[in-house]
């Protein structure tokens, strides 16, 4: 055998070994170094307006002019016409919305307003938070944004105990606000349909409960302070759908593709904060039928069938934001 042939065989053997090792590692571990930065005990420097500059590249400069939360004065004294129905606008739902805005608030707390530079983390519900030991790190951020019914009690070591903002919708409100939130947590309603306004009104005003019009029965009793409730401006759902996912805003009623609460929360953070980090985002591969998707329950991707969410498309959007430095990742993606 010539020396040239000998080296070719050695090279081929080496390639085979590398391939075997590569595929013996789980996909998540394989990409653990991508779009991930090691967590430091020191706070990362925060530069005022940095997230705004990054957001303008994605959403355009005009998006910062929009209020984060809906206000009564914009619907009571001056009619604010909306071009779209929920979840991308308020067209056709104004009367119900007025009643809700009359008993809730819209202000951003002084504890956030007064910050020279707002350091925020959006905590996803992903399985990769399990055994992450990120709780202490998460608690150090000025603003901690959580999603839906993701629990804190019993998981503090991995997800922290601080909750500044929690986004929810009626069907995801199956959590005890007294246990899973802090006393000053803002509960921000993401309205997908007019019945969502009706539900929150009946809860806060103790009226006859609504039982129909939901894909899952929401709580009939929910002990919350109306002054802690905010209504998210559906503008943020619109730009997340349009600018991040390229979804049509005018859709047939039976289709209704829409962003997940997680992607919506990142969009919100880029408009509220100066520094935005994320943790616990990402789903298993589509072929992985057994991997759980949340850190707190045993459900798989199968549970998202028919949800109107395209998680593959959202992964591309989040990867794009990570690549351009608009957000940084505490876990891996």
Swiss-Prot record:
Membrane topology: Single-pass type II membrane protein
UniProt topological domain (Lumenal) ranges: 27-333
Chief subcellular location: Golgi
Keyword Transmembrane helix: yes
Keyword Signal: no
Listed transmembrane segments: 9-26
UniProt family annotation: Belongs to the glycosyltransferase 29 family.
Name recorded for this polypeptide: CMP-N-acetylneuraminate-beta-galactosamide-alpha-2,3-sialyltransferase 4
Organism taxonomic ancestry: Eukaryota, Metazoa, Chordata, Craniata, Vertebrata
């Amino acid at each position: 055998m010539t020396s040239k042939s000998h080296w070719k065989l050695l090279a081929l053997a080496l390639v085979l070994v590398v391939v075997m090792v590569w595929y013996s590692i789980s996909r998540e571990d394989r990409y653990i170094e991508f779009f991930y930065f090691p967590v430091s005990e020191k706070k990362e420097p925060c530069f005022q307006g940095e997230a705004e500059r990054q957001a303008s590249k994605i959403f355009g400069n005009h998006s910062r002019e929009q209020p984060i939360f809906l206000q009564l004065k914009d619907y009571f004294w001056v009619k604010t016409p909306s071009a779209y129905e929920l979840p991308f606008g308020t067209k056709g739902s104004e009367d119900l919305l007025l009643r809700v805005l009359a008993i809730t608030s819209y202000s951003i707390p002084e504890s956030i307003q007064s910050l020279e530079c707002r350091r925020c983390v959006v905590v996803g519900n992903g399985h990769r938070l399990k055994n992450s030991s990120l709780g202490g790190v998460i608690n150090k951020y000025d603003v901690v944004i959580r999603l839906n019914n993701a629990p804190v009690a019993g998981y503090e070591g991995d997800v922290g105990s601080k909750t500044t903002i929690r986004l929810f919708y009626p069907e995801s409100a199956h959590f005890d606000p007294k246990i899973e939130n802090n006393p000053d947590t803002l509960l921000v309603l993401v309205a997908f349909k007019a019945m969502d306004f009706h539900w929150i009104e009946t809860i806060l005003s103790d009226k006859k409960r609504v039982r129909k019009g939901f894909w899952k029965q929401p709580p009939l009793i929910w002990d919350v302070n109306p002054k802690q409730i905010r209504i998210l401006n559906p503008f943020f759902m619109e730009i997340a759908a349009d600018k991040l996912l390229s979804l049509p805003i005018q859709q047939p009623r039976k289709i209704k593709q829409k962003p997940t609460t997680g992607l919506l929360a990142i969009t919100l953070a880029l408009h509220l904060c100066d520094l935005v980090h994320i943790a616990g985002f990402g789903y298993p591969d589509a072929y992985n039928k057994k991997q759980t998707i949340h850190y707190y329950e045993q459900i798989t991707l199968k549970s998202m069938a028919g949800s109107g969410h395209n998680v593959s498309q959202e992964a591309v959007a989040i990867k794009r934001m990570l690549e351009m430095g608009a957000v940084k990742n505490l876990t891996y993606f």
